[in-house]
UniProtKB/Swiss-Prot annotation:
Subunit relationships: Homodimer. Interacts with NR5A1, NR5A2, NR0B2 and with COPS2. Interacts with ESRRB; represses ESRRB activity at the GATA6 promoter.
UniProt cross-references to SUPFAM superfamilies, sorted A to Z: Nuclear receptor ligand-binding domain
Family according to the record: Belongs to the nuclear hormone receptor family. NR0 subfamily.
Cystines in this chain: none
The record's note on its domains: Homodimerization involved an interaction between amino and carboxy termini involving LXXLL motifs and steroid binding domain (AF-2 motif). Heterodimerizes with NR5A1 and NROB2 through its N-terminal LXXLL motifs.
UniProt protein name: Nuclear receptor subfamily 0 group B member 1
Role of this protein: Nuclear receptor that lacks a DNA-binding domain and acts as a corepressor that inhibits the transcriptional activity of other nuclear receptors through heterodimeric interactions. Component of a cascade required for the development of the hypothalamic-pituitary-adrenal-gonadal axis. May also have a role in the development of the embryo and in the maintenance of embryonic stem cell pluripotency.
GO cellular component annotations of the record: cytoplasm; membrane; nucleoplasm; nucleus; ribosome
Keyword terms, alphabetized: Cytoplasm, Nucleus, Receptor, Repeat, Repressor, Transcription, Transcription regulation
Gene giving rise to this polypeptide: NR0B1
Motif LXXLL motif 2: where in chain: 80-84
PROSITE patterns: NR_LBD
Residue positions of motif LXXLL motif 3: 146-150
Annotated organism of origin: Macaca mulatta (Rhesus macaque)
InterPro entries: NHR-like_dom_sf, NR0B1/2, Nucl_hrmn_rcpt_lig-bd, Nuclear_hrmn_rcpt, Nuclear_receptor_repeat
Amino acid sequence: MAGENHQWQGSILYNMLMSAKQTRAAPEAPETRLVDQCWGCSCGDEPGVGREGLLGGRNVSLLYRCCFCGKDHPRQGSILYSMLTNAKQTYAAPKAPEATLGPCWGCSCGSDPGVGRTGLPGGRPVALLYRCCFCGEDHPRQGSILYSLLTSAKQTHVAPAAPEARPGGAWWDRSYFAQRPGGREALPGGRAMGLLYRCCFCGEDHPQQGSTLYCMPTSTNQAQAAPEERPRAPWWDTSSGALRPVALKNPQVVCEAASAGLLKTLRFVKYLPCFQVLPLDQQLVLVRNCWASLLMLELAQDRLQFETVEVSEPSMLQKILTTRRRETGGDEPLPVPTLQHHLAPPAEARKVPSASQVQAIKCFLSKCWSLNISTKEYAYLKGTVLFNPDVPGLQCVKYIQGLQWGTQQILSEHTRMTHQGPHDRFIELNSTLFLLRFINANVIAELFFRPIIGTVSMDDMMLEMLCTKL
């Protein structure tokens, strides 16, 4: 019957009988014949050539006669074909293909259809591949948000440890990037996460330098770095560790030299003709205001050098016990020398000079020594410091202001004659006087004169030295 020509051949009944006969004869499902590369039929005009079913309720494969190649295969480009192809590739490929990270910028337009979709079992991320319109290869669409998310999630699970940043060459000062992130690596145990980016200059993966993330410490070890690696604070920074108390290493020699310098300073000031015409109270006002600065200029002229050592500052408990012992032991009348010592501030109550304050003194001396100031220049600088019209309590302000202006004029003429060229020497000499503002008179008194004069005030010493013949 099958090999003969019947009049019913081509009818619906004939086709049904032949289909039922072929179903019983072929217990196995024929495989789909996917030969040659064909774009497939997407119009759906051709009728179905065959319909093959599998026994036991298995899937049915629908074949269509392609209008391009004339062969029977599933209709490519249709929704059914895409679903079947994707399902077949999902079970066939257990591993996600790695993205081809070549020198291609990738396809960011999204005009090409997806070439493949690969899923991983266990709920792992899905890598979507696109046919690049630049290089013609299949790789994730670079530059898109989806590519960034998938690449970051993939490398987060792959890399167990964060590599160190590789600032190669001179690219470390670049603060921007144009390409995709090269990797994001997380450490187990809640440790810090290092984000790597592909640099648009050197082509390597390193942290985005110059950003807030790069400035943050990448590990707890860097946050707890040794204090030796940190830059030292300047001597005028009171928040640094330079507030430790210090004392003279050789107090007897240094204090005697400082006392001799103070005596020469007062002798220089006292016998100035323009200073002698002032009343005693005005002389005392000027000297009490500038004796420390004048002494520093004298010590710089004498080239006095000294060294200091750290001393242990008394604790708060020792201060409380000393004060309470002094208060409870004052019931009986004390003799005059003991009373004077009792009224004077004890050694624990006095402010001990700190290392930063002593460093300010040494900086001023070094500045003066570097300029090689002559004797006349020292004298003019002393006159500028002595005749200060801004001293509070001064009555003859105009007279003192004229003396300071005249001293500056003489110093300017002297530097112009001794040093050819512009007034750089005059400016450098006056810049040394600016450093005197960082030096406290009480520090000089405690450092150089307290071991000798004891509890005597420096103001009383100035009055006594002005009234006596030196």
